[in-house]
Amino acid sequence: MNNKIKTYLSQYAIYFVLLLLIIVIAIKDPSFISVRVFKDILVQSSTRIIIALGASLAILIGGADLSAGRLVGLAAVLSASLLQDPNYSARFFPHLPQLPLLVPLLITAIVGLLFGLLNGFVVSRFNVPPFIATLGTMVIAYGADNIYFSLPPNNSQPIAGLRKDFLELGTGGFLGIPYVVIIAVVITIIMWIIMNKTSFGKNLYAIGGNREAAVVSGVDVKKHILWLFAIAGTLYAIAGALEAARTGGATSEYGTMYELDAIAACVVGGWSVSGGVGTVPGVIVGVLLFTVINYGLTFIGMNPYWQLIIKGGERV
């Protein structure tokens, strides 16, 4: 009986914590319980959920992907630079013709995919720990981002003046539901299917649980590692483009520390850092918990320095 209770608490404790947190903030300020607030929380969580889903893949095999934040930043700058309004005076590419919306987004996704493949290649072919490999990629991506961002005529100025159709992707919605939330839900469903209903996802759990046993059972570990990082890189790029659309611009500092938030959300959501354990719903609740804390503390007017202490404590 005690073991059943412990198992139940370990699986669902975070859901109770999230509910309790909402109740506490609502008691402090009842206006917190509103459609507007919940919509804001969902919008702010959407890109973080996509990033965390990507980061969870490396955690599943007992690693950590530190390149997430910088790939988000690179994707934000790249997509924003290609999707400025033709009439904007300070365009990144003054003579670039207006491209169909999907073309720059596809280019951005491919860049993320290539960086992900680089991560996967280094980890799978040279047996470099994911932590080390992605640390190197993080620095490479940040350097590439700043070089690109500093190109004339932009010269490291914040990229603004984005096209209306791109901004609509980040701020608009369908039937009252923001597009970014819809995209996050679709990606979440796809990732759940991949992780639970495909041999690829099941093999990742096997690799994380016992790599030697997975090899003996015929799993191509190197191939799976290569493609898990490719998927992660693509997700980071999608999130970066959505961040640019949501905020109306981009700088080379976008995505700073996002990888740590993503890893923390996964761990809080029940993912084991030793690998082999974790669920997609756990990622979602982990991200929502952090978003509610961050949004809620600001909502009730807490001193910013106390917010930093609490945010640090929640990660501990």
Regions found by a protein language model. Name each.
Residues 20, 24-28, 32-89, 121-127, ...:
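Single transmembrane alpha-helix segments in multi-pass membrane proteins
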